[in-house]
């Protein structure tokens, strides 16, 4: 009998083992859809981004008007731009839900998969940041100035690093050109890291909602989960197109409709909504270096998740106390997101400081203590 090409061809074999004949736990829920959704988001972003780059000019005098030109004169340019801008928001929604699921279900115990995932998150954040600077509006310019300036808090070498990153003594043309180069390059790095992430995942196999070894009961990925993923795509692309077509500027800052002006500072400098939680943590510490360290720690703390897992059970499915803490953490992040969008005045300052403290206390102290307590209660 002739060999099945799908199973014998060197390239098709890899695709087959990853997307067709992959043994998958039979009980994974819709929370396991977000990985494939992130893949679709990334593909959409790269395609729309490529089309935008064809019409974009990375020059301070032309950047703003080149985007206006794209929206007005290019066939469906407005749609491509709106899909790209709002696609970023959707990508972040998916990645935050994906990470939340990982924390809830103890997926971080696949250490290599988890660590590559956190590196992916950091790369994605860098990509989104440099991308936000490209339209060269007021918030683009001042956001770039404020965030890059944080590196000057590094003792001794900080100022040198900032001027090296800027390519001068302020955010100007060299900064814009290099940010465009980086924004073009990083998504391909993300794609490469995604393949590494998947390689590690397929090495150990997927986790599942019960957190038990599922080897005794696995089903092929196709047709079961491929169908389920297509449903996920539809349910995700629907809100994206709705947003891009009906209220494309809902999540943007009106300040960015004004071309960048180094002489006029906007009243409230704030990043896009998906960075507000980290921005709130940064602002809640009055000291510059302290704020920068807290900002870095707010994401890097994810690397510690595998070390802080003290429970004898993998998931939180049967741990009511940890569940309570988990949802408190979610509420806490929503509060931080809200605080990040507010001006620095009473009562927002104290709320932000309390929420920032609670964020770290829950992750670093309460989760391990509660796990140990639950072990005792269950006589483990």
From Swiss-Prot:
Heme 1 (or BL or b562) is low-potential and absorbs at about 562 nm, and heme 2 (or BH or b566) is high-potential and absorbs at about 566 nm. It is a multi-pass membrane protein. Component of the ubiquinol-cytochrome c reductase complex (complex III or cytochrome b-c1 complex) that is part of the mitochondrial respiratory chain. The b-c1 complex mediates electron transfer from ubiquinol to cytochrome c. Contributes to the generation of a proton gradient across the mitochondrial membrane that is then used for ATP synthesis. Belongs to the cytochrome b family. It comes from the Eukaryota. The cytochrome bc1 complex contains 11 subunits: 3 respiratory subunits (MT-CYB, CYC1 and UQCRFS1), 2 core proteins (UQCRC1 and UQCRC2) and 6 low-molecular weight proteins (UQCRH/QCR6, UQCRB/QCR7, UQCRQ/QCR8, UQCR10/QCR9, UQCR11/QCR10 and a cleavage product of UQCRFS1). This cytochrome bc1 complex then forms a dimer. This is Cytochrome b. GO terms for cellular component: mitochondrial inner membrane; respiratory chain complex III. Keywords: Electron transport, Heme, Iron, Membrane, Metal-binding, Mitochondrion, Mitochondrion inner membrane, Respiratory chain, Transmembrane, Transmembrane helix, Transport, Ubiquinone. The keyword Iron applies. Its cofactor is heme b. Heme b b562 binds at residues 84, 183. The chain crosses the membrane at residues 34-54, 78-99, 114-134, 179-199, 227-247, 289-309, 321-341, 348-368. GO terms for biological process: mitochondrial electron transport, ubiquinol to cytochrome c. The keyword Metal-binding applies. One of its GO terms (molecular function) is ubiquinol-cytochrome-c reductase activity. It is found in: Mitochondrion inner membrane. Heme b b566 binds at residues 98, 197. A ubiquinone binds at residue 202. Its main location: mitochondrion. Binds 2 heme b groups non-covalently.
């Amino acid at each position: 009998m002739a060999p099945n090409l799908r199973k014998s061809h060197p390239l098709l074999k890899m695709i087959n083992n990853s997307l067709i004949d992959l043994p998958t736990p039979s009980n994974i829920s819709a929370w396991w859809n977000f990985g494939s959704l992130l893949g679709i988001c990334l593909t959409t972003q790269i395609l729309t981004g490529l089309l935008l780059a064809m019409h974009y000019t990375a020059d301070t005098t032309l950047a703003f008007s080149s985007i206006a030109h794209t929206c007005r004169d290019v066939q469906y340019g407005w749609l491509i731009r709106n899909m790209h801008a709002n696609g970023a928001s959707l990508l972040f929604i998916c990645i935050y839900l994906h990470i939340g699921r990982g924390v809830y279900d103890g997926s971080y115990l696949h250490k290599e998969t988890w660590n590559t995932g956190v590196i992916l998150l950091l790369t994605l954040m860098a990509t989104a940041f440099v991308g936000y600077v490209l339209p060269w509006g007021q918030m683009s310019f001042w956001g770039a100035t404020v965030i890059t300036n944080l590196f000057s808090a590094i003792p001794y070498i900080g100022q040198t690093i900032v001027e090296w990153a800027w390519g001068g003594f302020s955010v100007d043309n060299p900064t814009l050109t290099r940010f465009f180069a980086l924004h073009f390059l990083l998504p391909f790095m993300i794609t490469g890291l995604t393949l590494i992430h998947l390689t590690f995942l397929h090495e150990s196999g997927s986790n599942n909602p019960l957190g038990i070894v599922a080897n005794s009961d696995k089903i092929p990925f196709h047709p079961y989960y491929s169908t389920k993923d297509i449903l996920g795509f539809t349910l995700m692309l629907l809100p994206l197109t709705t947003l891009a077509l009906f209220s494309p500027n809902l999540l943007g800052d009106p300040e960015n409709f004004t071309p960048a002006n180094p002489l006029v500072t906007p009243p409230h400098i704030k990043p896009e909504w998906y960075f507000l939680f980290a921005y709130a943590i940064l602002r809640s510490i009055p000291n510059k270096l302290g704020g920068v360290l807290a900002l870095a720690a707010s994401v890097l703390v994810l690397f510690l998740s595998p070390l802080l897992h003290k429970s004898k059970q993998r998931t939180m499915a049967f741990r009511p106390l940890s569940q309570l803490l988990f949802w408190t953490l979610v509420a806490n992040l929503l509060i931080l997101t809200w605080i990040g969008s507010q001006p620095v005045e009473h009562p927002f300052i104290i709320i932000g400081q309390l929420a920032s403290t609670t964020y770290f206390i829950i992750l670093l102290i309460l989760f391990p203590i509660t796990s140990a307590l639950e072990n005792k209660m269950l006589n483990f």
